[in-house]
Amino acid sequence: MLDIKLILKNKDFVISKLKQRSNFNVSEIEKLYTLGTERANILISLSELQSKRNEISSKIGEAKRNKTDALFFMDEVENIKKELSILEEKSTKIENKIQELISFIPNIPLDDVPFGKDDTDNVILKEFPKIGRGLVKAKKPHYEIGVEKDLIDFSRGAKLSGSRFIVYKNAGAKLIRALESFMLDTHEKNGYSEIMPPFLVNSKMMYGTGQLPKFKEDLFKIEGHDLYLIPTAEVPVTNLFNNEIIDLEKNSKFSSFTNCFRSEAGSAGRDTKGIIRLHQFNKVELVEFASEQKSLRAFNSVLKNAKYLLELLEIPYREVLLCTGDLGFSSRKTIDLELWLPSEQRYREVSSVSYFGDFQSRRSMIRYRDENKNTQYVHTINGSGLAIDRVLAAILEQYQNDDGSISVPKVLIPYLNVEKI
């Protein structure tokens, strides 16, 4: 979340930056400014009353030592206590209202994020169309060849759980496992520590990374419990250090494979065929913690490692810088990696690498000690490394051969022990 002090000191700056986001009501900042100013004035009054109470209390002590009447001073202290109680209650109510409002305020885009209304205004930074077989045309879409080769069972997935659920079978299941292992092994070689977290977390953790309260409808909640299925490993891995002071020398780079669960509210009718948009999907996530000074270096590190996987898999891709109108709620800057999907003859997102500044760490109280031993909020960065189901879809289409077989990417052969499917 934003620092209320920033809003109080630079209200016009905050408004001008958040105006660049789509559908943001800047009147919320005005409300926060009014509440913050009112609370600041109350805190001044509280401080003055506390000083006055202490001063009078010393007079009471002096009167008792001199064996003179202290009743007047004692009555005055009681009156001050009543005033303090009223002001403290008022301050608490205002603070609660501030926290409620500020929980819905998105992050401030960095200056190098382009202005735009939606994804049509995103900026293509680089394209790598000649990797592997290049921008080929698929002989068959992944959902057809996946069924023909008995790799994916859509009908039984729907029977078990409903639409947007699938069953991987035989070499399909093995490919998912191979991709998971390949990605985690590669990240480990590049300095990431592997985490296997719970797939269920409580609402405090969802709040910490920015999913709650704003995106409640996108989540699967366990009825009767304060537990949610994770939409991404970002949630549990970031919150490993919720309300902690961490050592950035020991805890800074993590990778995690998890199943992810999203209700896809608002996505009705989109990507209804295939494995591009599922309620349950597989993903490896990269999370880095850094000081402010090293945060953009960490952002580039996550981006580099996600790109490296696509290069090893020899899948054409491009880098896309998201504009202000398409930027995620918690993000200050995001670069998407999009792989080539032959059946659609277009690029599809396979990783979003995002820099959050201290937005998440303020919500989740993750801090570190700087060189002067002062506590500071860490800066957080994460990105998919990679979305496995979408990578599988690209492989099934990109690596089709004339004889109907599917070649296995070279880097996956050691995991599958076959060259073709």
Swiss-Prot record:
Pathway: Aminoacyl-tRNA biosynthesis; selenocysteinyl-tRNA(Sec) biosynthesis; L-seryl-tRNA(Sec) from L-serine and tRNA(Sec): step 1/1. It comes from Mycoplasma mobile (strain ATCC 43663 / 163K / NCTC 11711) (Mesomycoplasma mobile). Homodimer. The tRNA molecule binds across the dimer. HAMAP family: Ser_tRNA_synth_type1. NCBIfam families: serS. One of its GO terms (molecular function) is serine-tRNA ligase activity. Belongs to the class-II aminoacyl-tRNA synthetase family. Type-1 seryl-tRNA synthetase subfamily. Its EC number is 6.1.1.11. It holds the Pfam family tRNA-synt_2b. It is an enzyme of class 6 (ligase). The lineage of its organism: Bacteria, Bacillati, Mycoplasmatota, Mycoplasmoidales, Metamycoplasmataceae. GO terms for biological process: selenocysteine biosynthetic process; seryl-tRNA aminoacylation. ATP binds at residues 262-264, 349-352. PANTHER family: SERINE--TRNA LIGASE, SERYL-TRNA SYNTHETASE. Consists of two distinct domains, a catalytic core and a N-terminal extension that is involved in tRNA binding. This is Serine--tRNA ligase. It is found in: Cytoplasm. It catalyses: tRNA(Ser) + L-serine + ATP = L-seryl-tRNA(Ser) + AMP + diphosphate + H(+); tRNA(Sec) + L-serine + ATP = L-seryl-tRNA(Sec) + AMP + diphosphate + H(+). The keyword Ribonucleoprotein does not apply. Catalyzes the attachment of serine to tRNA(Ser). Is also able to aminoacylate tRNA(Sec) with serine, to form the misacylated tRNA L-seryl-tRNA(Sec), which will be further converted into selenocysteinyl-tRNA(Sec). It comes from the Bacteria. Transmembrane segments: none annotated. Keywords: Aminoacyl-tRNA synthetase, ATP-binding, Cytoplasm, Ligase, Nucleotide-binding, Protein biosynthesis. One of its GO terms (cellular component) is cytoplasm.
